């Protein structure tokens, strides 16, 4: 397969991955009203554990449980729990479109954190785009106005932890394979959420399967196709498709929850997306 064909395949896998994550979020928005966040995360990590074992078997990686930097894997896994937890919590209080528009700041936050944590250099153009991206978030959450809610900060906190998680992921690739990272994410995730679920338990019955099974399946599909996408195309090609989450959030929010985003949300989302794609393109040139 030639280079262009591989990139096209990577893009197709990325679209499928983010579509899967979008369906997952639409389901989680309902599920979080009935079950604790930790119950939902526990199910997701169970499926990730199965996925990591299957992926290790497919790639014949018999040492997928051995990490060359256990401390970093644990930190990365804890950041994954925080990032996922805050995003799911945001769906309880905000529309899918609002949550994803604010959360879309994550790629920009990654660049900012990379400057302070990894000592990476950023151009003036990139800093301007980052500033514009933050203005986009302010347009969405509108601090000081009557419609502002402190709950609008939840996806912003999630985006911050996602930024830290992505940086930790970048560092773990220097030590371990994706199968190892998947395995430890699931292992630490299962351990932490099983403890927290004990304190935040909500009654489960057979009807719960209608929530839990799709959550586990679509989360696994999203991760699996994301891995395939990054194997076939550069991250700078794949990352802009992260913003399709906003498009699907508007569609699913309208059809399933009758949420219609206002002009400020749409305008803010456009600004965040445009500045985010610019930042991604600029950083890929370095």
Residue positions per predicted region:
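C-terminal transmembrane-helix exit sites in multi-pass transporters
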Residues: 87-89, 106-128, 200, 247-266
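Glycine-/small-residue-enriched transmembrane alpha-helix faces in small-molecule transporters
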Residues: 1-39, 147-171
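Hydrophobic transmembrane alpha-helices of multi-pass small-molecule transport proteins
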Residues: 125-141, 264-283
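Transmembrane alpha-helices of multi-pass small-molecule transport proteins
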Residues: 34-82, 161-164, 184-199
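Loop-to-transmembrane-helix transition segments
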Residues: 9-17, 56, 61-86, 150-158, ...
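Hydrophobic alpha-helical transmembrane segments of multi-pass integral membrane proteins
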Residues: 8-13, 39-54, 173-219
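Helix-helix packing/entry segments at the starts of transmembrane helices
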Residues: 99-105, 172-188, 223-254
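Hydrophobic/small/kink-forming positions within alpha-helical transmembrane segments
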Residues: 18-22, 77, 81-85, 107-112, ...
